[in-house]
């Protein structure tokens, strides 16, 4: 639902990628701006992939002054592992310590 999407955006550090005033990419960081950050909802529209835009988006995020003190970055992804590995992401050292809780909301 749009209401949940809007609330998630309001409570995140968001970055958009634009071409001729049209949004073609996006990423958001859920963070306390001190220790932890969760990278989420990263995308570049398919017709704009292969142009280095994902790299520019990641560079912008990881170089942003407000995000320099983050000690632990996390993400969940089904693809683009190669891109994220270039920024130091890897499988959890102790996956048995990672837990999640899902709640059906709609």
Predicted regions and their residues:
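A conserved beta-turn-beta hairpin within the catalytic core of GNAT-like acetyltransferases
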Residues: 31-39, 49, 94-95
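Conserved beta-strand in the GNAT
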Residues: 16, 22-31, 38-43
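Conserved active-site alpha-helix within GNAT-family acetyltransferase domains
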Residues: 55, 69-102
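Hydrophobic pocket-lining residues that define ligand/cofactor binding sites across diverse proteins
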Residues: 65
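Conserved acetyl-CoA pyrophosphate-binding loop and the N-cap/start of the following alpha-helix
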Residues: 48-57
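Active-site rim helix/loop that mediates acceptor-substrate recognition in acyltransferases
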Residues: 1-14, 18
């Amino acid at each position: 639902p749009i209401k949940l999407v809007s609330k998630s955006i309001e409570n995140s550090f968001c970055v958009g990628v634009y071409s001729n005033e049209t949004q073609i990419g996006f990423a958001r960081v859920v963070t306390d701006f001190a220790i932890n950050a969760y990278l989420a909802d990263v995308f570049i529209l398919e017709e704009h992939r292969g142009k280095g835009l994902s790299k520019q988006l990641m560079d912008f995020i990881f170089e942003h002054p407000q995000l320099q003190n983050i000690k632990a970055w996390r993400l969940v992804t089904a693809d683009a592992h190669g891109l994220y590995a270039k920024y130091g992401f890897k499988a959890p050292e102790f996956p048995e310590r990672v837990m999640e809780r899902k709640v059906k909301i709609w």
